[in-house]
Regions:
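Hydrophobic positions on the alpha1 helix immediately C-terminal to the Walker A/P-loop
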Residues: 62, 66
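Hydrophobic anchor at the beta1->P-loop junction of P-loop NTPases
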Residues: 51
Length: 211
């Protein structure tokens, strides 16, 4: 539709302005781009993670706990050892939970309510890629949580077709170039049998899948 065409044009313009260009392998290897860890051994950046499971199995609670440690800089236990956490902003893009439900889940993990490092955008749509890039430039989050893949897609695509994964390919391709490097966790619901839901292109588009 017209909105999708406009979004695609804006995306192409952003990539053009960022200077996508031909380079030699030598020039590529000399780039200062590196992968850092926000939480050592768990959350690298730039990185895109798909977290999937059945409803009510704690996917959201897991991500809120990770978010709490990043927003506050509190050490995180990794393999029985407390590891330092790089403190920074957290951006939650919510298309799945009601505001009341999200508040209750935050309370369950003792999320610090006076923390000004965490930003929530309700009724998010993955089709708003240009707005996403603006938010990334403005907030520069260490962690982005998208809850959930289907909830933020708004029925725009058939989840069994490869087009459904296009926004995830954009995240992986542009992370650290079109917008500041970050860790993106995308929550995805399993099918009624507990298996993976939707096209296999979803898993192919991300850096890692957690189940």
């Amino acid at each position: 539709d017209g909105k999708s065409q406009i979004e695609n044009l804006l995306k192409k313009q952003r990539r053009y302005e960022k200077g996508s260009e031909l380079m030699t392998v030598k020039e590529l290897m000399e780039l200062e781009d590196t992968r850092e860890f926000t939480i050592p051994g768990i959350l690298p950046a730039p990185f895109v993670i798909l977290l999937y499971g059945s409803g009510g199995d704690g996917k959201s609670m897991t991500t809120w706990t990770l978010a709490k440690h990043i927003a506050t800089g509190a050490p995180f236990l990794v393999k029985d050892k407390l590891m330092p956490v790089e403190k920074g902003p957290v951006l939650i893009l919510n298309g799945d939970q009601s505001r009341i439900q999200l508040k209750e889940q935050m309370e369950d993990v003792d999320y610090p309510i006076d923390n000004d490092n965490t930003f929530v955008h309700h009724d998010w749509s993955l089709q708003n890629y240009d707005k996403f890039c603006d938010l990334m430039d403005e907030i520069q989050p260490k962690l982005v949580i998208i809850d959930s893949l289907v909830g933020c897609s708004g029925g725009a695509f058939d989840e069994n077709k490869s087009d459904f994964a296009n926004p995830l390919y954009d995240f992986a391709q542009d992370n650290g170039t079109l917008f500041p490097a970050t860790t993106i966790i995308i929550i995805h619901h399993a099918n009624k049998n507990g298996g993976f839901r939707g096209t296999t292109a979803i898993r192919d588009a991300v850096d890692e899948t957690w189940a």
